[in-house]
Regions:
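Intrinsically disordered, low-complexity acidic/polar segments
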Residues: 15-17, 47, 59-61, 93
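Glycine-rich beta-strand-turn "strand-cap" elements at beta-sheet edges
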Residues: 2-3, 7-9, 35-49, 72-96
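Short, surface-exposed ligand-recognition loops at beta-strand->loop->(often short) alpha-helix junctions
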Residues: 9-19
């Protein structure tokens, strides 16, 4: 698995609007081959963190333009470019 994590800083009170933005783009996520899942959480009053799980880095790269077009629509809601971290899974624990 390949993971991509984005940390988005925003003005106080924008969290719900940002979450709504991502929810409104679910069709784009569904159309992204190899995307296993994505979730976002409120990390602080002024930060949202998103985690995307892909089958492989190649799958992410094939959909990068589509995903970037979604993120460009987020520009007016965030305070600057997101911090991005990415890499392949090194350790996994599943209780299932």
């Amino acid at each position: 698995m390949f993971y991509r994590v984005g940390k988005f800083k925003h003005e106080l009170g924008k969290t719900d609007e940002i979450m709504g933005f991502f929810k409104s783009n679910e069709d784009t996520f569904k159309a992204s081959e190899g995307l296993k899942g994505v979730f976002y959480f409120k990390a602080s009053e002024e930060e949202v963190v998103g985690v995307a799980m892909w089958e492989s880095k190649e799958h992410f790269e094939q959909s990068a333009d589509r995903i970037q077009s979604v993120l460009s629509g987020l520009a007016e809601l965030i305070s600057g470019p997101p911090e991005i971290y990415e890499g392949n899974s090194g350790y996994n624990f599943n209780k299932d």
